[in-house]
Amino acid sequence: MGKKDKRSKLEGDDLAEAQQKGSFQLPSSNETAKLDASQWPLLLKNYDKLNVRTNHYTPHVEGVSPLKRDIKNYISSGFFNLDKPSNPSSHEVVSWIKRILRCEKTGHSGTLDPKVSGCLIVCIDRTTRLAKSQQGAGKEYICIFKLHEEVEDDRKVKQALEKLTGALFQRPPLISAVKRQLRIRTVYENKFIEYDPAQQMGIFNCICESGTYVRTICVHLGLILGCGGQMQELRRNRSGICDENENMVTMHDVLDAQYLLDTQKDESYMRHIVRPLEALLTQHKRVVVKDSCINAICYGAKILIPGILRYDDDIEVGKEIVIMSTKGEAICIAIAQMNTSTIASVDHGVVAKSKRVIMERDVYGRKWGLGPVASKKKQMVKDGLLDKFGKPNDTTPKSWAKEYVQTSTKKEVKKEETPDEEEEEAPKKKSKKSKKQESSDSDSD
């Protein structure tokens, strides 16, 4: 008989408390973990199942787990899954929240028409950097439509809705916030729910691409049935990874949480309704990097093989991935330059290039240029074995060319070549100028 697993599966408030108070780094200890890795929070979930490239790195004191941030940073790097009320526009709601929280900026993940209610992801301060990534995510709606004439059978309505799936031509309605030009939008599924012949009204569920007008789908439904139709009511069930069944808050919750924080210094309500920005990235493939290279990435450096600790399965070239720290903080969204099998087999090269940096600069200390290769390179420049730009010259030893791997891209090499070409062109221009001057002198004579 094997040893019994002492780790218990926690649920509800107990799980939330354990995630907030627990330490999810791996210190050397004989104690059993309180939580199974499948219950670790946010980007650290199933951390033990990631592919390991190396376990050797120096942990830094800077940085903190997303759930343990102080309340100011917790709010500025968080978002709401807001239940938008009917009548005010999305921009009005977002500006009200900005005024309530007294934050620098707010944004949202896709406009809802004034009369439409439901999921609206409201991003605060630093999280606005992720608003674009959520705007392109899929949306799900529940719609009530009304037909202008009677329909003999419910099945006709169901068949007509099934026809309105796939890539559809749409022109925005007469009253809309965008230019009325023909465009293609994809409807993934139209699920018929109910139809009442007496009221000539029905309900259906629509899963579609962002930017799809459900109002236009209702008009097209009426055209297919030959009786005309219109949308009566609409609610968004899901926006990206957030749906109405999970952590949805109202405007009153935001007001109450801010009131408690201001008057009684009680953070619990605010921490309950605000979610860390890492929750928006849980569907992305992950790459974990060393603490020493985090600040370099924040300054725009590429993600190289020596800086990687762990990485996910099924990473594909050209796809978006999230670069994270060992504490579970999101550093940036990057475009993968290698797949999983390549990362496992090579010893140098560019793994990914950053697309959108999320973490602020200088949260972690500057550690670039302190490694053994960089230190040796600096010394060689000082001794004159390399030129002032760190490139080989006549005195450079041959062993250096074999040891040192240049990771600069082709574009950078081309840029370096262009000045020589310009120098060659310069004498030609001068000669042309001199000829002109001679001709002008002859004219004046």
Swiss-Prot record:
Species: Caenorhabditis elegans
Protein name: Putative H/ACA ribonucleoprotein complex subunit 4
Assembly with partners or alone: Component of the small nucleolar ribonucleoprotein particle containing H/ACA-type snoRNAs (H/ACA snoRNPs).
UniProt KW RNA-binding keyword: yes
Active site annotation, chain numbering: D113 (nucleophile)
CDD domains named among the record's database cross-references: PseudoU_synth_hDyskerin, PUA_Cbf5
Enzyme Commission (EC) number: 5.4.99.-
Region named Disordered: 1-32, 386-445
